[in-house]
Amino acid sequence: VKKYLLLPSLLLIFLFIQPAANAAVKKRYSPCKISYPSDALVEWDCYRLKRNETLEKLFGDRWQDVARFNRIDRRHAWPGMTLKVPRQLDDIKDFTPLPAVLPAAEQDEKFILVNLTEQFLGAYEQGRLVFSFPIATGDSKFVTPTGEFRVTAFSRNHVSSLYKIEKTRIPYPMHYALRFFISRKEVAFWIHGRDLPGYPASHGCVGLYDEEMQKKYYRNPDEPELMAARTLYEWAIGTTPDDGGLTRLKEGPRVLIIGESPI
């Protein structure tokens, strides 16, 4: 009799274990659920995306401004999520929450500022902002280190040695990667291309738009336009020879990381 009772007992154990495993899945957030100090500078409302709606369909040639303001890429603008939509789109034209002038970088030919609180990165030349992009960094669990660093290596075709693309065995692509820190546990931290879901979602690295990568691995979007990772990478390494692999950089740009994750 005990032999036949064993199977139902095992089944019950399995059913109770399953929810615990599912609970470990990383939580997703809509951009409307994330607060930034610069939100107060713009009047906006939450808008829930409907089926078949896209950033391009809703905002025409201003879709990139809305994407920047929400720190999101096109692939992650899903039906059901809520976006921050400015009442006046002109209020977010070329949106950036970063200072146009950074006195601490006046003596630097190239300088990178990462603001975790705002989830934005800026590139400076002699203390003047030349371009900026939204980012996805680590959250309170996978913390992005703060402080002063320097880009010491680069790798155009870099891939993760720890993480895979979801539901595949393909190493997660970290293209246009700039290494700025190696921890005492020998964990390397990079600025690189990745998905931008609209909230901090990395394992500690600093992620930038890379629609080239998304088209290659996810076949979406059809026409890549957001290529912040490539822009920063090419600016940072300048004329240094690049064979696509890991290359050390003797005097790379200084990197200053400030603030804390909004989640």
PLM segments and residue spans:
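Intrinsically disordered, low-complexity Ser/Thr-rich linker and spacer segments
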Residues: 32-39, 85-109
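Bacterial N-terminal signal peptides that target proteins for export
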Residues: 1-8
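LysM (lysin motif) carbohydrate-binding repeats in extracellular/periplasmic proteins that recognize
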Residues: 50-77, 131-132, 219
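Primarily a LysM-type cell-wall glycan-binding module
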Residues: 30-62
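Gly/Pro-biased beta-strand-loop elements
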Residues: 95-199, 253, 261-263
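Bacterial N-terminal signal peptides
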Residues: 8-16
